[in-house]
Amino acid sequence: GSGDHRLYQEVALGFGGYKALKLLGIKPAVIQLNETATIFAALARLDELCSNGMNLYEAIVYVRKHTLYTNHTLLQAAEPEFHRSQFEKLVLPNIKSNAVRCWLMEQFRNDRLRPNLLAIELTEAKNGVSKLHARVANFPDRNNDKVKFQAITNGIDLETWVLPETLQTYRDHGIIDKFGLPTNDFSEKLDSLSSADLRYLKKLGRKELNRVLLSRQDQYGKSIQIPENAILFDFKRRFANYKRPYMPFENPDSLRQILISHNAHYILTGKVHQGDVTMYQKLLEVLKLIDNDPVLKERVHYIQDYDEELGRALAIGSDASINIPIVGLEACGTSWEKDIANLKLLISTSDGGVAD
């Protein structure tokens, strides 16, 4: 949203984060702004330079040369916009330089400002998080020219998200190098893994998933266990309309037949944005559909309180991941990367990082 608390959080993160680095004796050569919410770190550096005697023009050039803006959003209009009075109350008290104060106030249009405009103005290097995202992201600058983003596809930390035994298998077979990156012939080496080894790793993953599920509750307030011999599909990501968590339930007859014929279960989990009333309603409709169908009621499980632990357990212990965003609306996504790193099948539209 665009309320005072959101701006307060961004101010605390940016100005407070930059001050914390100074107190730790850290003088960063380059600051990476991961999304617009961190922009006030660059503004804090600009204020510091001007307060120490550098003129505004030279300070802006310096900050631009030493700041990288990583954008994860496709449309500028989707980001928060704040009123001048909010900046006067929450931002200006953190700025000492009159030159920086005046420059900041000049960025407003009709008394409103999106902080991403500051990110565009105060950074020279800008990147999107997939090739497709960098190509289609629509962010105009002050002159209404489209900003050019370089493409750097998001990745994941294998140590965090991959079953340890699977990761060790990758190392033992030369599938990844000492930096955790795929080797040139990783595909051929993956193909050479035996079926027995793969089944063993999947068995370990299912055991870990069921351990986590013991402490979780489904839509009926009960814990569940997925049989070792059952195929498990999952949808585990933020519940946003463009991600279409409801799509598999638009044809319940087909879904029912798939689950029966393949001895399969389906886990649905994720969080709805607090203000997304439409998505809440769609989720409620899906849960009612499941409740009214004996097969779906037995085999489709909505797990409450989605978090990192559950996300990791499903990446490790499920068999196939459902990733079906509307093409052109996903910047990158990383859940699918965690899935394929754990040797799962990926059922996906070709969007974001998947398209790469």
Q: What do these predicted ranges mean?
A:
Residues 1-356:
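Catalytic cores of carbohydrate-active enzymes across secretory and cytosolic contexts
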